[in-house]
Amino acid sequence: MIPWLGPEPVFPPVSQALSHPNGLLAAGGDLSSRRILTAYSEGIFPWFSDGEPILWWSPAPRMVMFPDELKVSRSLAKTLRNLDYEIRVDSAFPEVMRACAEPRAGQDGTWIVPEMVAAYCRLHQIGYAHSFETWIDGELAGGLYGVSIGRMFYGESMFSRRRDASKLAFVHMVRHLQAQGVTMIDCQMHTEHLASLGARLISRDVFLATLKENVRHPQPDRMWDYHYRHESS
């Protein structure tokens, strides 16, 4: 059994999260900005499907990206050099979320339900949720979004409409956040896609200790002022 959350944004200790399913900690509550930010600051995130109650997770081990461990394959490096593209931040946040929510091959549905879209758009409006976007030929070709607290970034989801478009946004995000003093990016759960870019699993204790250190630091001024245009020679 897992606890059902009350009206206050208070969570049980993450040490109480289940092993099966990995990381399930609590259910219920709401998707208010206050509750979501409290959750992220404690290493917890919401993840549920349409028709389910709100479920809160803190898996162990945890998938993270340390920016200095970013891997860029030869083919991706070639794309970075030879493709005409533009990277923008926060120019189309709702569109990025809706694109991430679109059904994908082999999946019956999406966890980015309308309530989640509304909740994260509210976080974006108050400066806590951000998108990194790849634009090609004037069109949104791929990107990702996540939540930022202090010098901690929590990646949520990504999408591609063109080959490698989400990877382009990811590489620029990692390099930019590293320049801003971010030392760890939360990727939540293991995927081969993220592992190919250098993300890896770490223990819950290491994750929480690093998170605690990062969230207490104020963000640098103009942290989200980023724009890059690449034209192949």
UniProtKB/Swiss-Prot annotation:
BP GO terms, sorted: protein catabolic process
Keyword annotations of the record: Acyltransferase, Cytoplasm, Transferase
Record's catalysed reaction(s): N-terminal L-lysyl-[protein] + L-leucyl-tRNA(Leu) = N-terminal L-leucyl-L-lysyl-[protein] + tRNA(Leu) + H(+); N-terminal L-arginyl-[protein] + L-leucyl-tRNA(Leu) = N-terminal L-leucyl-L-arginyl-[protein] + tRNA(Leu) + H(+); L-phenylalanyl-tRNA(Phe) + an N-terminal L-alpha-aminoacyl-[protein] = an N-terminal L-phenylalanyl-L-alpha-aminoacyl-[protein] + tRNA(Phe)
One GO cellular component term noted in the UniProt record for this chain: cytoplasm
PANTHER family named among the record's database cross-references: LEUCYL/PHENYLALANYL-TRNA--PROTEIN TRANSFERASE, LEUCYL_PHENYLALANYL-TRNA--PROTEIN TRANSFERASE
UniProt xrefs under SUPFAM superfamilies: Acyl-CoA N-acyltransferases (Nat)
Protein name (database record): Leucyl/phenylalanyl-tRNA--protein transferase
Annotated organism of origin: Chromobacterium violaceum (strain ATCC 12472 / DSM 30191 / JCM 1249 / CCUG 213 / NBRC 12614 / NCIMB 9131 / NCTC 9757 / MK)
Domain of life: Bacteria
Subcellular locations according to the entry: Cytoplasm
NCBIfam families the record matches: aat
